[in-house]
């Protein structure tokens, strides 16, 4: 029993009394409660809209070439610790990603096998890591690899088949060969699509725009976020600038990275990651989607030129909305020491180089790169 207006009213009649009473007090109460209800409803709608603006943020970590040593032509090209510690200095950063990407610059193949044509095996750049090295990738946090490059066929069909077998068994996703043009996978409720392209034999061709559009558009139709990787552009420090034209190197058509990236985004890509030039290049933003034109040499033990710009690289930390739009990011700078192996660079050389190249090559780009490595969007692009 409750007392209202000094009358005893049974609980069963309270609601009826409240709704039908004509007293001034009850009319005022109904007005106040109606106002509170409407205000609360508007607030909830506003909160719901705010949550849906970026309802879920995903973190992508991305690096360039990884080759942790080769047992060809012999085991002297492997590190003294058998590769165990090469990725440990950067594991904490790499493992932050919902998706952590790299370009696999070689194959996993312990045994002997056919090798690509070489006149002198001591000067032949053919890379095969022992089978158990795949565990080092898993331990570091990598779960997505491009195999579209000039080294995936170094040891013929046998080396390639062994590599994809080990990647499958380890749970690492991959794409880039004619046999494996794309892959989709799900993590934490987000469906990802991934495709990789190159100019090399047996890979999905970067310069075949019609086929690339078809693959990317298909992924866009079945995925929340589409990631595209390409192995293209001329190599070396002298070729680090974006020309916006077709790049020819060693008499090979290495594509037009600037044009390809925009074509990919127009077709449905949300993130475009480049590698191949072996040095860092500029970053870009197109239709709210992030582009990295070259991620450089990240972890390449022996047999690589690591002098100057060849020995520095970024770890990109990219925050995307669940629809793939770029929100914010950070450039973590690394350098390779000794025969190779990444460590954090306190001088932030990769950051400084990428910032400089972006400002020089893409002055219209609205990305803002801070001295601390943070990447934000300019007001023009946000609009």
Question: Which residues does each predicted region cover?
Answer:
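Short terminal hydrophobic/aromatic SLiMs and anchors at protein ends
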Residues: 4-5, 19
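Residue-level detector of alpha-helix boundary/anchor positions
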Residues: 2-4, 56
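Positively charged N-terminal leader segments that act as targeting/secretion signals
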Residues: 7-15, 23-25
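Acidic, metal/ion-coordinating pockets
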Residues: 47-383
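Bacterial Sec-dependent N-terminal signal peptides
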Residues: 19-49
């Amino acid at each position: 029993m409750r007392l209202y207006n000094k009358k005893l009213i049974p609980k069963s009649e309270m609601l009826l009394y409240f709704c039908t009473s004509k007293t001034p007090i009850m009319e005022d109460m109904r007005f106040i409660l109606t106002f509170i209800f409407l205000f609360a409803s508007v607030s909830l709608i506003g909160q719901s809209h705010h949550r849906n603006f970026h309802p879920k943020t995903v973190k992508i970590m991305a690096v360039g070439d990884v080759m942790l040593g080769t047992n060809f032509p012999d085991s002297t090209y492997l590190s003294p610790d058998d590769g165990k510690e090469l990725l440990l200095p950067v594991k904490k950063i790499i493992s932050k990603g919902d998706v952590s990407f790299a370009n696999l610059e070689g194959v996993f193949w312990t045994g002997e096998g056919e090798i690509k044509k070489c006149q002198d095996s001591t000067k032949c750049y053919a890379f095969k890591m022992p089978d158990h090295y795949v565990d080092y990738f898993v331990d570091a946090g990598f779960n997505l690899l491009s195999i579209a490059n000039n080294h995936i066929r170094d040891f013929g069909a046998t080396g390639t088949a062994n590599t994809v077998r080990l990647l499958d068994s380890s749970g690492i996703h991959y794409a880039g060969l004619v046999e494996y043009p794309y892959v989709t996978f799900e993590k934490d409720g987000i469906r990802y699509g991934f495709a990789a392209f190159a100019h090399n034999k047996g890979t999905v061709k970067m310069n075949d725009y019609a086929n690339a559009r078809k693959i990317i558009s298909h992924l866009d139709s079945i995925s929340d976020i589409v990631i595209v990787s390409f192995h293209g552009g001329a190599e070396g420090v002298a070729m680090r600038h974006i020309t916006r034209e077709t790049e020819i190197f060693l008499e090979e058509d290495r594509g037009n990275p600037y044009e390809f990236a925009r074509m990919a985004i127009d077709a449905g890509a949300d993130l475009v990651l480049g590698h191949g030039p072996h040095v860092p290049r500029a970053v870009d933003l197109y239709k709210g989607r992030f582009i990295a034109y070259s991620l450089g040499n990240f972890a390449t033990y022996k047999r690589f030129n690591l002098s100057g710009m060849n020995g520095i690289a970024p770890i990109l930390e990219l925050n995307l909305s669940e629809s793939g739009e770029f929100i914010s990011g950070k450039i973590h700078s690394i350098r390779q020491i000794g025969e190779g192996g990444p460590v954090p660079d306190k001088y932030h050389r990769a950051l400084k180089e990428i910032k400089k190249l972006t400002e020089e090559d893409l002055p219209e780009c609205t990305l803002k790169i801070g001295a601390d490595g943070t990447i934000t969007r300019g007001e023009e692009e946000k609009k």
